[in-house]
């Protein structure tokens, strides 16, 4: 896999945490959908910079989200692992996707 660096925020507002809890709870008929939405929600709220293989870092929110949606299966797995580790360190009270 290419060398990647994802910079994430270290704070979430109480309102954002409440929104995330609602997303994680999601549609009880589709746990997979709720899981996918929770990963995208966290990425959208936490990602501030993404450097891929030494290229110019992506820092604009719209571009970050567009690149996330275009990510390969391997990149999405790496993003999930990165988000889980970040939640464990900075937000241990939040449920990881």
Where are the language model's segments positioned?
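Short, surface-exposed, charged amphipathic helix/loop patches that serve as local interaction elements
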Residues: 2-97
